[in-house]
Curated annotation (Swiss-Prot):
PANTHER family: CYTOCHROME C OXIDASE ASSEMBLY PROTEIN COX18, MITOCHONDRIAL (PTHR12428:SF65), OXA1 (PTHR12428). The gene is yidC1. One of its GO terms (biological process) is protein insertion into membrane. Keywords: Cell membrane, Chaperone, Lipoprotein, Membrane, Palmitate, Protein transport, Signal, Transmembrane, Transmembrane helix, Transport. Residues 1-21 form the signal peptide. It holds the Pfam family 60KD_IMP. CDD domains: 5TM_YidC_Alb3 (cd20070). It comes from Listeria monocytogenes serovar 1/2a (strain ATCC BAA-679 / EGD-e). One of its GO terms (cellular component) is plasma membrane. A lipid is attached at C22 (N-palmitoyl cysteine). This is Membrane protein insertase YidC 1.
Length: 275
């Protein structure tokens, strides 16, 4: 789990640096691979869609965002299925894992800790538990899409100068930036449904980094990028709720584990109050 968190944090920080620190002139014509095969096709597609919606580039960006999300939806569903499968295995292995973790806390020497950690790895192997199997591919795929959106908007005077609702697509908008951040914060809480309190604590930092990064970047990036995030986040939240409903019905042991964790936390809280 720690290795996966490091990978995700690296990806998010990479996106932050790229979107806030790139110095390439977006108006400059380039014949590079990224420009030729990603930026220019994105720009052309947005303009193509805009022709069918009365030249409204805001609606064109929304449609493009939904199409992108629909295209990567099978990959997201596969990832969600893997996550639910991992949660199911963790629920079954939980009694053994809890017992080993308790002994690990009582261990007094490094040799004893190493021996107990080997036992933990044996349990993981026994139940075929590997958090890295859940993967980060959906997030990695979105990186070039974000960059293409960014430069397509800044490189097109038609898109950059277009006003949609109350904001200009080519300029930052604080209200939309906050909306995009809140949408992804809500999406994070939706994604935590079904996880045990202990797992939620482990994933809290990486989970909150995404909305914080989106909020930070949206304050300085073209508002069209915040629009992409807001629409994409709403789509992703709905998709997550759907997959949770579908897969959690197939893995009732996850609900049992979550209920047991909640009951345990309530007992701990009551004991603290009594003291």
């Amino acid at each position: 789990m720690k290795k996966k968190n490091i990978i995700l944090i690296s990806v998010l920080l990479g996106a932050l640096l790229l979107l806030t620190g790139c110095s390439m002139d977006p108006s400059q014509n380039t014949d590079g691979f990224f420009s030729t095969y990603l930026i220019q096709p994105f720009t052309s597609f947005i303009m193509f869609v805009a022709k069918f919606v009365g030249g409204n580039y805001g609606i064109a960006i929304i449609i493009t965002t939904l199409l992108i999300r629909a295209l990567i939806m099978p990959l997201n569903l596969r990832t969600a299925k893997a996550q639910m499968g991992m949660q199911s295995k963790m629920a079954v292995a939980k009694p053994e894992i809890d017992e080993i973790q308790a002994r690990l806390k009582r261990a007094t020497s490094k040799e004893e800790q190493a021996t107990i950690q080997k036992e933990m790895m044996a349990v993981y192997s026994k139940y075929n538990i590997n958090p890295m199997q859940m993967g980060c591919l959906p997030l990695l795929i979105q990186m070039p899409i974000l960059m293409a959106f960014y430069y397509a908007i800044r490189g097109s005077s038609e898109i950059a100068s277009h006003t949609f609702l109350w904001f200009n697509l080519g300029s930052p908008d604080m209200v939309l930036a906050i909306i995009a951040g809140l949408v992804y914060l809500a999406q994070y809480f939706v994604s935590m449904i079904g996880y045990s309190p202990e797992q939620k604590k482990q994933m809290k930092i990486i989970g909150l980094m995404s909305p914080i990064m989106i909020l930070f970047v949206s304050f300085t990036a073209p508002s069209a990028l915040a629009l992409y995030w807001a629409v994409g986040g709403l789509f992703l939240a709905g998709q997550t709720l759907l997959t949770k409903k579908l897969y959690m019905n197939k893995h009732p042991e996850i609900k049992v584990m979550e209920q047991e964790e909640k009951e345990f936390e309530q007992i701990v809280e009551e004991q603290k109050k009594e003291k």
